[in-house]
């Protein structure tokens, strides 16, 4: 099923009972209201509103006015009409702790409790993310995730969320996309210095490797600490973490150096997290790489065991595309990977469109990591020039094909025993895509940023039909 082969006979009936069909968003990307209700400043307010790293006039204050109840009630009605039975959204650390450390801002509690009440009134179950990149500016200045004290910062914040929302919410995503957050922040800091990277250093190498591995360890420890607090207090429900996984591939004529680099990239981006969570250790090859380079990654005795023993209740998987890796030509370092984009691959904004690698990922988790409960916390795509509003419609054919083929791939993996319990499209709406600003659209719902008018796209229509149990295939993704 490579590159959009026909998905035959696929219906929502091919998934387990009580399956979660949803869409996802993140607070910073949709809410707007930069200075509303006592909110503090995150590092992203600094990057975009003050330093304009996404371009002139691109401000986080625009967004989708999702803090406006009149507006979000209309959005909830759209979700209901599509047939969603769940919606994933995030809280903001900088809203609850405006200065990163001080008293809790209780106005945030009231807002989100009302939002959850409104979701549930529409029959939509909340999946709540605690942290989606909104590090308070003060904590970022103190080192952010590179600082081991971030474990305690996050644990204290998580305890506030659990205390105020565990009666409304029974599933929490603790942290979203550690590897992508770290890479995007590195890129932002480079841009502040007038330097430009063609791509975020999502495949960490060179000087970025120490920062990345140290941050990854602290993020996993922070998740473990939050889970420990959850258990001590006896809250009911499940905790997970949303991790971006990248199947790592090489080309047919790959050299031994290409394959060696690909193996290490897999270790850094995939096995680093899965091995710690489900085996209680970090990958030996990655630890050796760090030791050989004399890197201070702050992995202390007992760290990986603590992460394993936390026993998170589900694994959140964010899947977009695989990475094709080769060894850089004329590189002086033994480990010198680079991402390539083979010409024969159909490409979305995030890389090659490969639903077969989605299946491979789900079945790898099944076979190598004990088949834990899995929720697909993000899956989606954006395509250059596709999201055009014409005569009141957006015929996003490529996104529609992407979703149909990836849902079909998921269904086939479920039939082969993968323990997948939910699926969330990224994203519900077009939104602010970090350093890309508003030019990269990923939503199933088109947003006119000037008027805030919403228009469901073709992909939303077809996704709704899948949820309702209609028999859908690629041929349904056709424009009028």
UniProtKB/Swiss-Prot annotation:
GO terms for molecular function: beta-glucosidase activity. Keywords: Carbohydrate metabolism, Cellulose degradation, Glycosidase, Hydrolase, Polysaccharide degradation. The keyword Manganese does not apply. InterPro entries: Glyco_hydro_1 (IPR001360), Glyco_hydro_1_AS (IPR018120), Glyco_hydro_1_N_CS (IPR033132), Glycoside_hydrolase_SF (IPR017853). Its EC number is 3.2.1.21. PROSITE patterns: GLYCOSYL_HYDROL_F1_1 (PS00572), GLYCOSYL_HYDROL_F1_2 (PS00653). It catalyses: Hydrolysis of terminal, non-reducing beta-D-glucosyl residues with release of beta-D-glucose. Coiled coil: none annotated. GO terms for cellular component: cytosol. Belongs to the glycosyl hydrolase 1 family. This is Beta-glucosidase A. The gene is bglA.
């Amino acid at each position: 099923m490579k590159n959009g082969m026909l998905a035959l006979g696929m219906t929502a009936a091919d998934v387990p009972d009580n399956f979660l069909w949803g869409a996802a968003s993140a607070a910073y990307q949709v809410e707007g209201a930069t200075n509303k209700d006592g909110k503090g400043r995150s590092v992203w307010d600094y990057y975009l509103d003050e330093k304009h790293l996404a371009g002139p006039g691109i401000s986080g204050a625009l967004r989708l006015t999702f803090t406006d109840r009149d507006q979000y009630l209309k959005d909830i009605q759209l979700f209901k009409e599509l047939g969603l039975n769940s919606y994933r959204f995030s809280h903001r650390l900088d809203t609850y702790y405006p200065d990163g450390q001080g008293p809790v801002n209780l106005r945030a509690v009231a807002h989100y409790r009302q939002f959850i009440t409104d979701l549930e009134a529409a029959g939509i179950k909340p999946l709540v993310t605690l942290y989606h990149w909104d590090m308070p500016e003060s904590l970022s200045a103190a080192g952010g995730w590179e600082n081991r004290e971030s474990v305690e910062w996050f644990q204290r914040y998580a305890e506030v969320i659990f205390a105020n929302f565990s009666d409304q919410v029974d599933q929490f995503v603790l942290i979203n996309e550690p590897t992508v957050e770290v890479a995007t922040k590195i890129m932002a800091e480079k841009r502040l210095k007038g330097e430009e990277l063609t791509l975020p250093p999502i495949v960490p190498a060179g000087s970025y490797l120490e920062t990345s591995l140290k941050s990854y360890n602290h993020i996993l420890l922070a998740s473990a600490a939050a889970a420990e607090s959850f258990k001590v207090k006896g809250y009911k429900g499940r905790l997970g973490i949303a991790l971006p996984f990248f199947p790592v591939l090489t080309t047919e004529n790959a050299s031994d150096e290409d394959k060696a680099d690909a193996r290490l990239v897999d270790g850094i981006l995939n096995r680093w997290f899965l091995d710690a969570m489900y085996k209680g250790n970090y990958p030996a090859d990655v630890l050796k790489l760090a030791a050989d380079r004399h890197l201070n990654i702050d992995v202390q005795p007992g760290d990986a065991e603590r992460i394993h023993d936390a026993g998170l209740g589900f694994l959140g998987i964010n899947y977009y595309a695989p990475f094709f890796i080769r060894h850089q030509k004329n590189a002086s370092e033994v480990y010198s990977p680079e991402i390539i984009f083979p010409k024969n691959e159909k490409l979305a904004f995030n890389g090659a469109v490969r639903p077969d690698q989605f299946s491979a990922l789900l079945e790898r988790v099944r076979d190598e990591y004990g088949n834990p409960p899995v929720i697909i916390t993000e899956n989606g795509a954006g395509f250059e020039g596709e999201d055009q509003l014409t005569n009141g419609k957006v015929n996003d054919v490529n996104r529609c094909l992407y979703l149909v083929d990836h849902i079909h791939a998921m269904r086939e993996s479920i039939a082969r025993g993968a323990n997948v319990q939910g699926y969330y499209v990224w994203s519900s709406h077009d939104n602010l895509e970090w350093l890309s600003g508003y030019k990269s659209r990923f939503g199933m719902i088109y947003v006119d940023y000037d008027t805030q008018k919403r228009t469901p796209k073709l992909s939303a229509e077809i996704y709704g039909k899948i949820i309702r149990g209609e028999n859908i295939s690629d041929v349904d993704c056709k424009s009028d």
